[in-house]
């Protein structure tokens, strides 16, 4: 599979999460939060896509000229564990190379608010990534947003489906803003520069 990024092709940025107001503030929905902020920056609202089970925003990011990129922001509406279906449908509809796909997701094995950008690799037990990888292979970009490990013996499923704590919420806007910056840097400047700036 060709994983070379194509500057002339559109980028597909999929913020992962679960649909519905009861999940909106969960740790597992931080990908949706980042996608919402990116849409706000573009100045557009998410709309239901006619051919995929997803909400999308189409726009451009970056300065005028060769660094300006066409971007499709997406929030799969299929629930986290089957994110691969909507992402694949959007990939096919917009003819996006796999190397131009970015999944934004929560990551248990990284401290809260810390970012890690990478291309390819395993799913680390993340069911949203597992679903996408099953459909597309592993060679897409990831922006991993650290949420930390659950306290004590709390089951992982309970932890990720709970809202951020009151202490975490004090910094959440800052961290989501930084993650959106990282996505923009990845799309505009490339992975290595974005990693240098945001892999903390």
Curated annotation (Swiss-Prot):
InterPro entries: Pept_tRNA_hydro, Pept_tRNA_hydro_CS, Pept_tRNA_hydro_sf. The record marks 18 as: Discriminates between blocked and unblocked aminoacyl-tRNA. The record marks 106 as: Stabilizes the basic form of H active site to accept a proton. It comes from the Bacteria. It catalyses: an N-acyl-L-alpha-aminoacyl-tRNA + H2O = an N-acyl-L-amino acid + a tRNA + H(+). The keyword Oxidoreductase does not apply. Its EC number is 3.1.1.29. GO terms for biological process: protein quality control for misfolded or incompletely synthesized proteins; rescue of stalled ribosome. It is found in: Cytoplasm. The active site is at 28 (proton acceptor). Its main location: cytoplasm. Keywords: Cytoplasm, Hydrolase, RNA-binding, tRNA-binding. Signal peptide: none annotated. TRNA binds at residues 23, 79, 81, 127. GO terms for cellular component: cytoplasm. It is an enzyme of class 3 (hydrolase). One of its GO terms (molecular function) is tRNA binding. Monomer. Belongs to the PTH family. Hydrolyzes ribosome-free peptidyl-tRNAs (with 1 or more amino acids incorporated), which drop off the ribosome during protein synthesis, or as a result of ribosome stalling. Catalyzes the release of premature peptidyl moieties from peptidyl-tRNA molecules trapped in stalled 50S ribosomal subunits, and thus maintains levels of free tRNAs and 50S ribosomes. This is Peptidyl-tRNA hydrolase. It comes from Streptomyces coelicolor (strain ATCC BAA-471 / A3(2) / M145). The gene is pth.
């Amino acid at each position: 599979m060709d994983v070379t990024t194509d500057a002339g092709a559109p980028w597909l940025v999929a913020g992962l999460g679960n649909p519905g107001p009861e999940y909106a503030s969960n740790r597992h929905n931080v990908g949706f939060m980042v996608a919402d902020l990116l849409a706000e920056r573009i100045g557009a609202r998410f709309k239901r896509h006619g051919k995929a089970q997803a909400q999308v925003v189409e726009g451009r990011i970056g300065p005028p000229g060769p660094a300006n990129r066409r971007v499709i922001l997406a929030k799969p509406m299929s629930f986290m564990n089957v994110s691969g279906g909507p992402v694949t449908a959007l990939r096919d509809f917009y003819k996006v190379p796999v190397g131009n796909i970015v999944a934004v997701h929560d990551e248990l094995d990284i401290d809260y608010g810390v970012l890690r950008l990478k291309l390819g690799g395993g799913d680390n037990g993340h069911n949203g990534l597992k679903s996408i990888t099953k459909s597309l292979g592993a060679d897409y970009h990831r922006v991993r947003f650290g949420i930390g490990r659950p306290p004590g013996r709390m089951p992982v499923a309970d932890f990720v489906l709970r809202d951020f704590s009151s202490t975490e919420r004090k910094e959440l806007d800052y961290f989501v803003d930084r993650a959106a910056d990282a996505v923009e840097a990845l799309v505009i400047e490339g992975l290595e520069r974005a990693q240098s700036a945001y892999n903390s």
